[in-house]
């Protein structure tokens, strides 16, 4: 029996992957927001958590898990291609090699930290969203979205910064950076929440899906 792919699900999945890849590339630039110094990935990475919330809310944990693994695979693929391109000698007349290498030749330690943090944070976000939906019988979406994002973003930052920069940046500075990232990413979720609510309602109406993960074995691959 053929499985029909939902158009809204497919579009959100594509956007999820685009946001993750863009965030990894933007992470190479450090930007200033007022007195705060953050990476440019902050501009787009929180959107992946918002999409994760939408997918877990509408289609359940299994579909969220599928999208998370696809995001991991696409990120790994892009990183691998980037490292291969960096390793291939550039044309003698090309002057942009140094800048290209800076963007795509990310240190293996940072790449590993990013992929590890993404997996743990995203799965925690989807898990909390799924469990709270069942416990609340589908009510209080706003609270569930904010709390699940806070849990996921906290786990992401607690893994990424120590693994990527431990021993390079002072631990006090790392702690400050982690707190800033967690707070700003969570604020991002709160600010865009009215849009998220409308999108979820529209998708449920169009797609006719509203999955509750009752009695779901979360560790099962199927």
Region locations from a protein language model:
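Residue-level signature of transmembrane alpha-helical entry/exit and packing/kink sites
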Residues: 8-13, 38-41, 106, 110, ...
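Hydrophobic transmembrane alpha-helices
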Residues: 1-72, 76
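Internal alpha-helical transmembrane segments of multi-pass membrane proteins
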Residues: 135-154
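A structural feature that tracks compact, well-ordered secondary-structure segments
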Residues: 149, 160-166
